[in-house]
Amino acid sequence: MAEPSQAPTPAPAAQPRPLQSPAPAPTPTPAPSPASAPIPTPTPAPAPAPAAAPAGSTGTGGPGVGSGGAGSGGDPARPGLSQQQRASQRKAQVRGLPRAKKLEKLGVFSACKANETCKCNGWKNPKPPTAPRMDLQQPAANLSELCRSCEHPLADHVSHLENVSEDEINRLLGMVVDVENLFMSVHKEEDTDTKQVYFYLFKLLRKCILQMTRPVVEGSLGSPPFEKPNIEQGVLNFVQYKFSHLAPRERQTMFELSKMFLLCLNYWKLETPAQFRQRSQAEDVATYKVNYTRWLCYCHVPQSCDSLPRYETTHVFGRSLLRSIFTVTRRQLLEKFRVEKDKLVPEKRTLILTHFPKFLSMLEEEIYGANSPIWESGFTMPPSEGTQLVPRPASVSAAVVPSTPIFSPSMGGGSNSSLSLDSAGAEPMPGEKRTLPENLTLEDAKRLRVMGDIPMELVNEVMLTITDPAAMLGPETSLLSANAARDETARLEERRGIIEFHVIGNSLTPKANRRVLLWLVGLQNVFSHQLPRMPKEYIARLVFDPKHKTLALIKDGRVIGGICFRMFPTQGFTEIVFCAVTSNEQVKGYGTHLMNHLKEYHIKHNILYFLTYADEYAIGYFKKQGFSKDIKVPKSRYLGYIKDYEGATLMECELNPRIPYTELSHIIKKQKEIIKKLIERKQAQIRKVYPGLSCFKEGVRQIPVESVPGIRETGWKPLGKEKGKELKDPDQLYTTLKNLLAQIKSHPSAWPFMEPVKKSEAPDYYEVIRFPIDLKTMTERLRSRYYVTRKLFVADLQRVIANCREYNPPDSEYCRCASALEKFFYFKLKEGGLIDK
C-alpha cells in the first residue's frame, strides 16, 4: 500500500458530510480511495488500526479486562497501552523533526496557493519513499522542489504556515499522524459500517488540517453528555442505595467493585450493530446504532487519535446504552475473570469471583427494573446515610437508612453472630460503647441476636477455604457425585464452548439466514423423533411460524434439543409448545439448563409466567423445573390464546426476576458449603463437654432429640414446629402488617424510633450500628412489598430494639422506651397470631 501521506488528496471543496444518526445507507464500493470516495451516512462499527501496528494485531480490553465484541484486527481506537504508546511515540517523533521536515509533511495536506486556477490540494513528493514509514529517514525536501501533481514548488503549499507558532505546527502534525492511522484503518477494516465512520473521521481531520481548525463532529448525533444521569452517577447511586447501611469497610468493598466495573466499561469494546441485531428486537437496533456511532466518535477512536476530543463512556452515556450492552458485557467480563483467576491475588480472587457476580446481578435488577430510583435526576438519600465518622455525643435511639437485602451469605446475611459475654466493668461513660453485663444469661443474649450479622472477615475467610482445593480435605467432589446438580454438566460444557444456546425463529422480512433455517429443520427433526404422537406437519407449521420462537441447544454445530414457545406480552405469559432433547443426549442436565436459559430470557423481556400442556410422560420433568398444576394466571387471560391438547395437563411456572436461574444450583451449593463451614466453626467454639447418655443401658430404645443435653445451646431447633402462622396470601399479609405497624407507630414509646438517626446528634452511630433500622424505613419497605414473609417484618422490629440497646446505656430513656415498645409489639404479634402465644 502506498504511503498515506503521498496518497491522492481530496479537493478543498470536498467537505465531510455532517455525521447523521445511523440510517440504512448504500454499501460503498469496496476499499475506496479515501481521497476520492463519497462519504455515505456512517453507521457504527469497531475502531481503526494504528498505522504502526502490524496487520492483524488486536486491541486489548483495557486494564484487567478483555475486549468485548468482535472486530477486525489491528485497532488504534480500541488500543491496548502498547498501541497508544505507538501512536504517542509516532507523534513525538514527528514533532521532534526539523521545521523544514515538518513543513514538508504539512504540505502534503495543504492546497496549492500559487494561483487561483490551481486545484492541487496537497503537495506530492517527486521522490516518494520506497517503503512506508521511510519518509522520516529521508532528508527534508527543499521549499523549491516542485509538486509531482501541479508542478508548483513546496513553498506555494506551505506559505500560510510561515508565521504560525511552533505549538500550532505540532498540533497540526498530531492530526497528520491521526489521518495516516485512519487511512490505514479505512483500508484494513472489513465491516462496511465501520469503514464509513472511519472514512468520515478521516475526511474531517483532513479538512481541519487544510483549514487549520479544530475537529468537531457535526450532525444530528448531538453533543456529550447524551444522557443524565450518566452511567457513573447511576452506578454510584446504586452503591449508595443498596449498601450505605454497611460498615465502612464493607461499604468500601462495594465502592471498589463499582469503580472496577466503571473502569471496565470505559475500556470495553462494544459489539457492532450487526452483532446486536442478531440478539435484539428490531426497534432496539436503531437506538443502539445512534449510541454506537456516538461511542465510536467521542470515546473509542479518540483513545489513540487524540486530535479528536475524548470522553469517558461512563461520563456521557446513561441507562439507554447500559441496557443495550449489560447482559453481553457482564457475561464476557465474568468469563474473562474466570479464565484469568489464577493470575489474581487471593484477596482479589475472592472479591471478584464471589462478590462481583452478585454485585452485577443486583445492578442488573436496577438497570432493567421499571421503577429504580437510582436513575432519577434528583436521587438523594437521607442525611443519616453519610459516611463521615466522628466521635459521638450522648445516647441516641436506633435508626436506619433505607436499604434492601444484600449479598447473602457472602456479604453479611445469614446466621446470627456470637455476642461477647465479657464483663462490662463500670457503668459506661457518655459516648462510650456498652459491652454486655457480666451476669447476662444465654437467654438474654439470644434476645439481642438479630439475623444477618456475620462479620465480613469471617465470610471472606470461609470463602477462601471452600475455593482453595488444598484446604478442602475429604472425598473429591465431581460431576459423578450423587450431590452434583442436574445441570452442572451442561453448565460446564457451556462455559467450555461445547454447547451453545440460541433463540431463533423464522422471519419473512428480512428473510432468515441459511444457518437459522438449517437449525429450524434440525429442531423439527428432533421434535418429530421425540414426540412421535404429534403430527409432523403440525410440528413443522409451528416451528417455522414467525410468531413462534425456539431456544435451540447446539452441540458440535448441530441441533440436539430445544424449547419451542410463543410469547404473549400483552397477556403477560408465554406458551411452551414443544420441549425435547434428542434421546442419546439425555440425562446430562441439558433439559434443566435449557429451561433455565429460557427463564432468564423471559425475565429480560418482563414476562414472568409460563403455561404449557404436559402429557403424562412430561409432567415429572416440568415439576422438576418449578411447574405446578395450580394455575394462578386468570383463565380470561389465556383462554383462546393457547392450544388445548386432549389428555394433557395444563401446568404453570411463575418466574422470580431476582433469581439467576442458570447459576441457581451453583449458588445454592456454595451457600450450603458456607453454612457447613460456619457450623463447623461454631461447633469448635462450644467447649462444654457433657457426659454420655446412660438411659440406653436401662433399656430405653430411643429418646427425643431435644432431650439430648446441650443440644439446644448449639442452636438446634425442632423441625416441623414453625412458630406462628405464615400468611400465604400476600395481600392479607400486607394488610395485617400495615395495621400492626400503624399501632406500633402510635404507641407513646415509639417516638425515638420514628425517623433515622441524624448524624448531627450521633456522628458515629453508623460506625457502631452496622444494620440500622427505624419505623419510617419499615413503612417504606412495607409500601414497596419488601416484607414477603412475617419473619422479615419481625426481624426488623427486633433489630430496632437490639440496635437501641447496643448503642445506649441500659438506664437511658431510649432503652426504657425500647423495652416498653418491645412488650407492646410482642403482645400484638401474639394477638395477631404471627408468633406462638
UniProtKB/Swiss-Prot annotation:
Task performed by this protein: Protein lysine acyltransferase that can act as a acetyltransferase, glutaryltransferase, succinyltransferase or malonyltransferase, depending on the context. Acts as a histone lysine succinyltransferase: catalyzes succinylation of histone H3 on 'Lys-79' (H3K79succ), with a maximum frequency around the transcription start sites of genes. Succinylation of histones gives a specific tag for epigenetic transcription activation. Association with the 2-oxoglutarate dehydrogenase complex, which provides succinyl-CoA, is required for histone succinylation.
Ranges of residues in domain Bromo: 728-832
Higher taxonomy: Eukaryota, Metazoa, Chordata, Craniata, Vertebrata
Compositionally biased intervals (Low complexity): 75-87, 416-425
Parts of the chain that traverse the membrane: none
Biological source species: Homo sapiens (Human)
Mutation effect (Y601F): Reduced ability to acetylate and inhibit PPARGC1A
Residues recorded as bearing Phosphothreonine in the entry: T735
Superkingdom classification of source: Eukaryota
Protein name according to UniProt: Histone acetyltransferase KAT2A
Subcellular localization: Nucleus; Chromosome; Cytoplasm, Cytoskeleton, Microtubule organizing center, Centrosome
